[in-house]
Amino acid sequence: MFQLNEIRRKLYHQIGYKDIISEDELSVQDWDGICEYKKLSEEFIREFEDKIDWVIVSRNQTLSEGFIREFKNDVFWHYVSGCQILSEDFIREFEDKLTWRYISEYQNLSENFIVEFQNNIDWHV
């Protein structure tokens, strides 16, 4: 199993997703590999939203705030909090969905914002 996964990983790095998509059937593992190892456009993710793994996409793909908003019920907020670049306005809008430990550790926050959300900030990171 490990060798097969390693081979797939190398293939994903070497060929574009359009070449892979031409196959009639893709396994869950194939879709996971595509989501993890290929840079996907939001258009591609939108087109195959029912096939992709949203946990992997939320962690490994670069998503715009508008796209995250559009798919707010699909994205994995834990990874959005730490792996996406978020504006303070976006963080305010979705403060109840976000993981504040990762917001505190990975987002670039102004002093005013930190004061405003001092009760949410994880001071131990």
Features from the language model and the residues they span:
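Alpha-helical scaffold segments
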Residues: 1-125
